[in-house]
Amino acid sequence: MKALVIDDERLARTELIRLLEPFKEIEIVGEAVNADDAHDKISELNPDVIFLDIQMPGKTGFELLEELDNVPKVIFTTAY
């Protein structure tokens, strides 16, 4: 399963990726730092699942989802 990690906090992305390492069925195909970056990477990488922060500078995770034509499975990962 291809996964994309989306969070504006570098430490949060790094820690989540570390926690997912034991799950060999999950392949981290990329990271995004905001909604615009995520939109481009979702189109380019076509992940099966995204780990998505809600509160980010600019657009929120919810606003990102509204913009997508094809929405992958979503797991919200937020400290909100």
Residue spans for each PLM region:
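A short, hydrophobic beta-strand element within the central beta-sheet of small alpha/beta folds
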Residues: E66, V71-Y80
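Two-component/phosphorelay signaling modules centered on CheY-like receiver
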Residues: R10-G30
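Active-site beta3 strand of CheY-like receiver
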Residues: L45-F51
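Receiver (REC) domain active-site loop signature in two-component systems and cognate sites
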Residues: M56
